[in-house]
From Swiss-Prot:
Known catalytic reactions: a D-aminoacyl-tRNA + H2O = a tRNA + a D-alpha-amino acid + H(+); glycyl-tRNA(Ala) + H2O = tRNA(Ala) + glycine + H(+); D-tyrosyl-tRNA(Tyr) + H2O = D-tyrosine + tRNA(Tyr); L-alanyl-tRNA(Thr) + H2O = tRNA(Thr) + L-alanine + H(+)
Keyword tRNA-binding part of the UniProt annotation: yes
UniProt protein name: D-aminoacyl-tRNA deacylase 2
GO cellular component: cytoplasm
Family: Belongs to the DTD family.
Gene source species: Homo sapiens (Human)
GO biological-process terms attached to the record: aminoacyl-tRNA metabolism involved in translational fidelity; tRNA metabolic process
Protein task: Deacylates mischarged D-aminoacyl-tRNAs. Also deacylates mischarged glycyl-tRNA(Ala), protecting cells against glycine mischarging by AlaRS. Probably acts by rejecting L-amino acids from its binding site rather than specific recognition of D-amino acids. Catalyzes the hydrolysis of D-tyrosyl-tRNA(Tyr), has no activity on correctly charged L-tyrosyl-tRNA(Tyr). By recycling D-aminoacyl-tRNA to D-amino acids and free tRNA molecules, this enzyme counteracts the toxicity associated with the formation of D-aminoacyl-tRNA entities in vivo and helps enforce protein L-homochirality.
Top-rank taxon, per record: Eukaryota
This protein's domain notes: A Gly-transPro motif from one monomer fits into the active site of the other monomer to allow specific chiral rejection of most L-amino acids except L-Ala. The trans conformation of the motif is maintained by Arg-151.
SUPFAM superfamilies: DTD-like
Length: 168
C-alpha cells in the first residue's frame, strides 16, 4: 500500500478466479462479439494516476505476480507464478475515482494516451515475466488482457470473495 501521505501512481485490484471471460469487442451487425478467457488464476484490474511513469512498471509486475495470494490444493498460499495460474489483465479507470458529494470524479487518473501506453507496457511486461517462468511455460499459462478505453463485459467465477487492493 502507499506509505503515509504519498500520492499513489497506480492502483491494482487482484481477484482470484476459477474462470473469467472478458468481452473485448461487442457484436457488430453480422460480426460476433470477441472474448478472451482464462481458467483458474488471477484477474488484475489496473489503473494509472497522473505522475505514473514506465519506471514504476517493473516493480508493479514483480509485486503483483509474486505476491502469495493463490491457494494450492493443500491450502498453501503461493504466487500466481508458482501456482501456476492464468492471468487476465483489465484496465479499470474507475479504481481512480474519488467520491465528491454524490458523484464520482476521476481527476487523478492519467490522461488517455499516457494511460494507454502504461497499460500496454504493463501487459507486455507481464507476458514476458510469465513466458520466462519455467513452471508457467510447462503449464502453458495464458495471459489475456482487455482493451484500454472500452467498456467491457466481464463474466467471472471466483472461489470466494478473495480480493486485494495494492497501491504503488
Amino acid at each position: 500500500m502507499a506509505e503515509g501521505s504519498r500520492i499513489p501512481q497506480a492502483r491494482a485490484l487482484l481477484q482470484q478466479c476459477l474462470h473469467a471471460r472478458l468481452q473485448i469487442r461487442p457484436a457488430d451487425g453480422d460480426v460476433a462479439a470477441q472474448w478472451v478467457e482464462v481458467q483458474r488464476g488471477l484477474v488484475i484490474y489496473v489503473c494509472f494516476f497522473k505522475g505514473a511513469d514506465k519506471e514504476l512498471l517493473p516493480k508493479m509486475v514483480n509485486t503483483l505476480l509474486n505476491v502469495k495470494l493463490s491457494e494450492t490444493e493443500n491450502g498453501k498460499h503461493v504466487s500466481i507464478l508458482d501456482l501456476p495460474g492464468n492471468i487476465l489483465i483489465i484496465p479499470q479507470a474507475t479504481l481512480g475515482g474519488r467520491l465528491k458529494g454524490r458523484n464520482m470524479q476521476y481527476h487523478s487518473n492519467s490522461g488517455k494516451e499516457e494511460g494507454f501506453e502504461l497499460y500496454s507496457q504493463f501487459v507486455t511486461l507481464c507476458e514476458k515475466e510469465v513466458a520466462a517462468n519455467s513452471k508457467c511455460a510447462e503449464a502453458r499459462v495464458v495471459v489475456e488482457h482487455g482493451t484500454y478505453g472500452n467498456r467491457q463485459v466481464l463474466k467471472l467465477d471466483t472461489n470466494g470473495p478473495f480480493t486485494h487492493l495494492i497501491e504503488f
